[in-house]
């Protein structure tokens, strides 16, 4: 039913308590619809509407970068390092970080991974999360790099940014090689030995 909203049972055992919880949930939904803060969501960290508007594209790009890095990296990963440069370092990047972690884990753990449990799911796999906000010049107004580092310190990475007046999401680096690829659809990544006679 499209008009039904369900919430988890919160332990309100009396009629009055259940009514109060119902009113509180309705007020929270009204707040979100009027541009307020997302509070007490079941599968999303709390964010105000302005943060959702500003970070929404980065959340989407981050998820795609996480998925890409997981697919180009081997199964044994010791550290997942996420580095931010540019304007984004001034913001709370928690939702972007969780989107990257969720994207990285999606093909491993399936749909059971969400924005709330992604950090814990990563930890359970023995992967250390490392978040860096860099003030160094990246050459872009905003850049996100995701690195999967193996136990022997081999790094597999992808970086993304937004290009042009319309802020089109682009993958600009894969494993340290500069590229410019739209961050959408399917992407075939091949690596071969760079030697004469090899195509």
Question: What are these regions, as identified by a protein language model?
Answer:
Residues 1-2, 10-199:
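NAD(P)-dependent dehydrogenase/reductase Rossmann-like domain
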């Amino acid at each position: 039913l499209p008009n039904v909203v369900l919430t988890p049972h919160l332990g309100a055992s009396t009629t009055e308590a259940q009514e109060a919880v119902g009113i509180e949930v309705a007020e929270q939904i009204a707040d979100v619809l009027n541009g307020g803060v997302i509070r007490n969501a079941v599968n999303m960290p709390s964010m105000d509407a302005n943060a959702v508007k500003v970070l929404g594209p980065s959340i989407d790009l981050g998820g795609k970068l996480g998925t890409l890095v997981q697919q180009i990296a081997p199964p044994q990963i010791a550290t997942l390092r996420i580095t931010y440069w540019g304007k984004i370092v001034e913001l709370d990047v928690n939702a972007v970080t969780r989107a990257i972690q969720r994207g990285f884990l999606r093909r491993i753990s399936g749909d059971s991974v969400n924005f709330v449990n992604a950090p814990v799911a990563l930890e359970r796999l023995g992967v250390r999360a490392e978040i860096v906000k860099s003030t160094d010049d990246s050459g872009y107004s905003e850049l996100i790099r995701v690195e999967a580092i193996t136990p022997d310190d081999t790094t597999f990475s992808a970086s993304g940014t937004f290009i042009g007046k319309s802020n089109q999401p682009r993958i600009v680096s894969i494993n340290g090689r500069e590229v410019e690829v739209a961050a959408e659809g399917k992407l075939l990544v091949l690596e071969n030995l760079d030697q004469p006679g090899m195509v």
